[in-house]
């Protein structure tokens, strides 16, 4: 067996105008595909550790040292992107009632949440991700990670993710990351967020 590049759950142009087809094609077929290939190359060196990336990245000390960083970078890149694709929707969706209530409880209002999430995504220096996670206490928390690091390695369960690497937005938004973040909020798959939230509680 090997890690497989998942197909997008929609057409490459389905998220336009927010996310353009050229960016989606490059992002999925080139960037994500490279993470998958590099992950498989690392795992082939140590078949004894298996292929459950979530378990491996939950405790990176269990990953053999010679492939540890490769799996953090590439295995994390695969998991992050596989989740990211599922969190985007061609059809506009309203926030589900359970997630809306949890957001109100954690942040005071949806607007406050959106402001804090945007700040986390904008403030991430260089490449990385912004996240809404369920933490170890079962509470919602906004965080960001560098590179392809995943909150799973911190014992947190991601329920919303935004890729802020420049390859995710530069063709369409150039260096104006806030406009990309604003567009992201227009195409979130809130049903998937709810599904992840219910599973993480």
Swiss-Prot record:
Key words of the record: Manganese, Metal-binding, Oxidoreductase, Secreted
Top-level enzyme category: oxidoreductase
Cofactor: how bound: Binds 1 Mn(2+) ion per subunit.
Compartments, as annotated in UniProt: Secreted
Keyword Oxidoreductase in record: yes
InterPro entries: Mn/Fe_SOD (IPR001189), Mn/Fe_SOD_BS (IPR019833), Mn/Fe_SOD_C (IPR019832), Mn/Fe_SOD_N (IPR019831), Mn/Fe_SOD_N_sf (IPR036324), SOD_C_sf (IPR036314)
Chain positions recorded as Mn(2+) binding sites: 27, 81, 163, 167
Cofactor: Mn(2+)
E.C. numbers: 1.15.1.1
Alphabetical list of SUPFAM superfamilies matching this protein: Fe,Mn superoxide dismutase (SOD), C-terminal domain, Fe,Mn superoxide dismutase (SOD), N-terminal domain
CC annotations in GO: cytoplasm; extracellular region
Stored PROSITE patterns: SOD_MN (PS00088)
Major location (coarse): secreted
Reactions catalysed: 2 superoxide + 2 H(+) = H2O2 + O2
Family statement drawn from the similarity comment of this UniProt entry: Belongs to the iron/manganese superoxide dismutase family.
Entry function: Destroys superoxide anion radicals which are normally produced within the cells and which are toxic to biological systems.
Known partners and oligomeric status: Homodimer.
Protein's recorded name: Superoxide dismutase [Mn]
Species assigned in the record: Streptococcus pyogenes serotype M3 (strain ATCC BAA-595 / MGAS315)
């Amino acid at each position: 067996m090997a890690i497989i590049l998942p197909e997008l759950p929609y057409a490459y142009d389905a998220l336009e105008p927010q996310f353009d087809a050229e960016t989606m094609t490059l992002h999925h077929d080139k960037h994500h595909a490279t993470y998958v290939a590099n992950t498989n190359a690392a795992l082939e060196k140590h078949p004894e550790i298996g292929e459950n990336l979530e378990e491996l990245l939950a405790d990176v000390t269990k990953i053999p040292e010679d492939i540890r960083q490769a799996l953090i970078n590439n295995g994390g890149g695969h998991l992050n992107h596989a989740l990211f694709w599922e969190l985007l929707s061609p059809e506009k969706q309203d926030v589900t009632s359970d997630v809306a209530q949890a957001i109100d409880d954690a942040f005071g209002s949806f607007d406050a949440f959106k402001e804090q999430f945007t700040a986390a995504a904008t403030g991430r220096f260089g490449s990385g991700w912004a996240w809404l996670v369920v933490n170890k206490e079962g509470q919602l928390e906004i965080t960001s990670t560098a590179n392809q690091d995943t909150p799973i390695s911190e014992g947190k369960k991601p329920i919303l993710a935004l890729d802020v690497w420049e390859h995710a937005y530069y063709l369409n938004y150039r260096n104006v990351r806030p406009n990309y973040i604003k567009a992201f909020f227009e195409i979130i798959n809130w049903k998937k967020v709810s599904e992840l939230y219910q599973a993480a509680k």
